[in-house]
Amino acid sequence: MTTAAVFGSTGAVGGQILATLLASDAFSSVKTVSRRLPNAQSPKLQTLEEGDITKWGGLIASLSPKPSIVFNAVGTTRAAAGGIANQWKIDHDLCIENAKAAKEAGVKTYVFISSGGTRGFFSRYVPYSKMKIGVEDAIKELDFEQAIILRPGLILQREKPKAALLENIVQNLNKLGQGVQDMIGQDQTVIGRAAVAAARMAEEGKAPSKYWVLEQADIVRLGRDEWKQ
């Protein structure tokens, strides 16, 4: 049985990761670290509420039993953070600090929810893309026993859409064919399931590489087409 910890469990994808972990018999214990407690409840769930995000990384070593897998689904927007500088502190600095703390604590598998399109020629100069690239590169350099990076497209079916009009347009693209929508956006549940499925494969020694990047097609395949509870 496996123990996992989730950062960002109150967000769209993080919440789906948490729900999937709690529903899976493969995980005996699930921990969360967040500024506010998640709504989920389960006998195997242990929640830690910490308003000071600079303390999050240090809490990993205090978790018992120690998680073998850590999921990082932390993310915010420029508007919610109050500017690009504050967003950088969360989407870049905090994520790297948590990854370093996980490595020091002996975590075997680290799963990071990044974003699709960040490595494009023009997008790499966009601040948001630079944040994600910085975190991805830092995780790779930390040399975890297994690192998994998910690069989803537009996140769909969120309870509180961040770009309601755009998300609604992409959501309706399935009328032209599911494959059309899949190239642009993925359901939050599918992304969460893909993250857990990939982590389970890594635990079973079935990951295709030590540093495994899942693009949008991979996310759809693992989180929907091949998904098994």
Curated annotation (Swiss-Prot):
GO terms for biological process: import into nucleus. Residues 1-45 form a transit peptide. InterPro entries: NAD(P)-bd_dom (IPR016040), NAD(P)-bd_dom_sf (IPR036291). It comes from the Eukaryota. Pfam families: NAD_binding_10. Keywords: Membrane, Mitochondrion, Mitochondrion outer membrane, Transit peptide. One of its GO terms (cellular component) is mitochondrial outer membrane. It is found in: Mitochondrion outer membrane. The gene is fmp522. It is a peripheral membrane protein. Belongs to the FMP52 family. Transmembrane segments: none annotated. This is Protein fmp52-2, mitochondrial. The keyword Membrane applies. The keyword Transit peptide applies. Its main location: mitochondrion.
